[in-house]
Amino acid sequence: MNTAYIISAYRTAVGKAPRGLLRFKRPDELAAETIEYMVNKIPALDKSRIDDVIVGNATPEAEQGLNIARLISLMGLKTDDVAGVTVNRYCASGLETIAMATAKIKSGMSNCIIAGGVESMSLIPMGGYKPIPDYKIVSQGKEDYYWGMGLTAEAVAKQYNISREDQDKFSYNSHMKALKAQKEGRFDDQIVPIDINHTYVDEKNNKCKNKYTVTKDEGPREGTNTDVLNKLRPVFSKKGTVTAGNSSQMSDGAAFTLIMSEAMVNELNLKPIARMVNYAVAGVEPRIMGIGPVKAVPKVLKQSGLNLNDISLIELNEAFACQSLAVINELGLDKEIINVNGGAISLGHPLGCTGAKLSVQLFDEMRKRSLNNKYGLVTMCVGTGQGAAGIFEFVK
């Protein structure tokens, strides 16, 4: 069986949605600019030798429809030769694409694939424009199939006894870690600069242009403290504990990896940065979807022949503070190695992009810590009751 290596990995900064810095950029453009930047960093690679572009997207409609992956390939690679396919596993979509690319290369079906994800929550609302539940299913008592994520978070908080105080403290720490990471420049190497050219009409009906470059995640809040977080009202239940402050931020962003067979890596004399060791998904009750990693992580560890003591760093998607804490508690995870530079509560959660974004952050942090030949874990809960987890080995 072939070995598949990740050669390059980049992401955009994450913009707030719906009124953040990336709201004027279409998702196909955002992703195309990201892969163009990444591929241009590898002059030895003939773009026509890329077999496919696999793009994760959680809401593939409107500006994200029409098989956005193929459009991204055409726009970003400037060639007709490279195909594209769009993948949807909600919040795990970006990680799923890396697993798909790895599997195809290991099997010999491909030699070189771009894999990642993109999401514009500024342009496409959560769940899409017109979700239509099956009311026969609802009438049979399965309404949790269609629950909003906030309701599932409240269910997790209640079932796993996660207090409001602990949720707010977790959220505060997420912001503090992210702010510290930004000040230290720990994200700088992984972020693709995105130029925005925005034309608008001012209050005097004059046509104006606004130009700027996005290079920094918008989410981390300098003035956040536990007192501020404690004063926020519950969003999903009057007597609940889940607030806007202890939930992930709606966001815009893109992240991509370039994955190659070992033979192609050697031919082009390139240096790999990581390889996906294994990947697993698992199902849980939709009403407590946030607990998904509790089933997915043991599964991927078993498939890899590893245990938690073998894992040096963990990127756990912070969909909500309550579900993150429940996962940490249930799995007995070491908090010191989880989201060392903050998570989705502070940095944002651009749905279909997130799995790839967390992978990019993991590789870069493992490089900075010289964790050569060590293992890292990316995991997240997934809507409608799923969990996903991928284990990577940092290679030097």
Regions found by a protein language model. Give the residues of each.
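N-terminal extracellular/periplasmic Venus flytrap/periplasmic-binding protein-like
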Residues: 11-13, 24, 28-33, 44, ...
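Conserved beta-ketoacyl condensing-enzyme motif
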Residues: 23-113, 118-136, 191-214, 287-288, ...
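Conserved catalytic cysteine-centered active-site region
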Residues: 25, 57-111, 132, 144-151, ...
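Short, well-ordered amphipathic alpha-helical segments that serve as non-catalytic structural scaffolds
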Residues: 27-43, 68-72, 97, 149-156, ...
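Active-site-proximal alpha-helical scaffold in enzymes
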Residues: 87-118, 157-187, 256-263, 328, ...
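Active-site pocket-lining segment
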Residues: 190, 277-346
